[in-house]
Design a protein with these regions (language model features):
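Intracellular juxtamembrane helix-capping segments at the cytosolic ends
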Residues: 125-138, 145
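Helix-breaking motifs and short loop linkers at transmembrane-helix boundaries and internal kinks
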Residues: 51, 83, 104-107, 138-139
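Short hydrophobic/small-residue motifs within alpha-helical transmembrane segments
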Residues: 64-69, 154-155
Length: 161
């Protein structure tokens, strides 16, 4: 009896493999929802709640994005020391907590700080930790798996916009 090889399969990853794929897809979903599209969608409502303009909130988002990249670099160093699995969980939790701070910020300073932390941590969860998880879990099918996981970007845009 010939066993069928999954060498050429693009779906035979097993339950644990699909769990990882969906987990990483959701990290990208939240990244787009919190940062890329989400920050533009909430700017008007946040500005109204703070008594400022949407343009000011967009400026805060730009500053937060630059600060988020700095956080991203710091998390990269920590990621190498304690591992991608632990860091992805830590980053997702921090991003969720600080996003609540974004939505409830009393002024633009608090908003910018919370958005910077949210940006840096959710970006780190998806790109730094997620990339390492894919490389470790799917050493021979990284490209196919990254194709599935990055669908989170497009699905989030379709849902949020």
């Amino acid at each position: 009896m010939n066993k069928k090889s999954n060498k050429d399969s693009v779906v035979a990853f097993g339950g644990a493999g699909w769990f990882h794929i969906i987990y990483m897809l959701l990290m990208f979903w939240f990244y787009v929802g919190m940062i890329n599209d989400g920050s533009n969608n909430i700017a008007g409502n946040i500005a109204e709640a703070m008594g400022t303009t949407a343009g000011n909130i967009s400026n805060c988002n730009a500053i937060a994005g630059v600060l988020g990249v700095i956080i991203f670099l710091i998390v990269g160093v920590v990621n190498r020391k304690i591992g991608a699995r632990m860091m992805s969980g830590i980053n997702c939790i921090i991003a969720g907590i600080t996003y609540m701070g974004v939505l409830n910020a009393p002024n633009t300073v608090v908003y910018t700080i919370m958005m910077a932390i949210t940006c840096g941590t959710i970006m780190s969860a998806g790109y730094l930790c997620g990339g390492v998880l894919v490389a470790n879990w799917f050493p021979k099918k990284k490209g196919i798996v990254m194709g599935y996981t990055t669908m989170g970007h497009n699905l989030a845009t379709a849902a949020f916009v």
